[in-house]
Swiss-Prot record:
InterPro entries according to UniProt: Ribosomal_bTHX/bTHXc/bTHXm, Ribosomal_bTHXc/bTHXc_plant
Species of the source: Arabidopsis thaliana (Mouse-ear cress)
Family statement: Belongs to the bacterial ribosomal protein bTHX family.
Protein name, UniProt field: Small ribosomal subunit protein bTHXm
UniProt key word Mitochondrion: yes
GO terms for cellular component: mitochondrion; ribonucleoprotein complex; ribosome
Length: 98
């Protein structure tokens, strides 16, 4: 658990230094109202978590379904396809088939 917290803190620290250095470079080259300056900061904000629509947590937050958060019935069908069983086989699978 401590390792995960340490890695998260390191990642945040790295991202903050990159964001500040990008902002300094951008403000030195362009005016502060330029949309070219705002674009890198916006893209770095959606890394992971609730705001990321590609993760399971993000899909729960948005209320949508997809490959990373599939519905139960679709998951069962994918398992049956892996086992090469007809989809009409009842779930849970009989013990002899497992």
């Amino acid at each position: 658990m401590a390792a995960m917290q340490w890695c998260g803190a390191m990642t945040r620290r790295i991202m903050m230094t990159q964001r500040t250095s990008a902002a300094l470079n951008c403000s030195a080259r362009y005016s502060s109202l330029s949309p070219a300056c705002a674009a890198p900061a916006v893209s770095e904000m959606d890394l992971c978590g609730r705001g990321d629509k590609k993760t399971k947590k993000g899909k729960r937050f948005k209320g949508s379904y997809g490959n990373s958060r599939g519905k139960k019935q679709k998951m069962i069908e994918r398992i049956k396809d892996k086992l090469e069983l007809p989809r009409s086989t009842p779930w849970p699978l009989p013990f002899k088939l497992i």
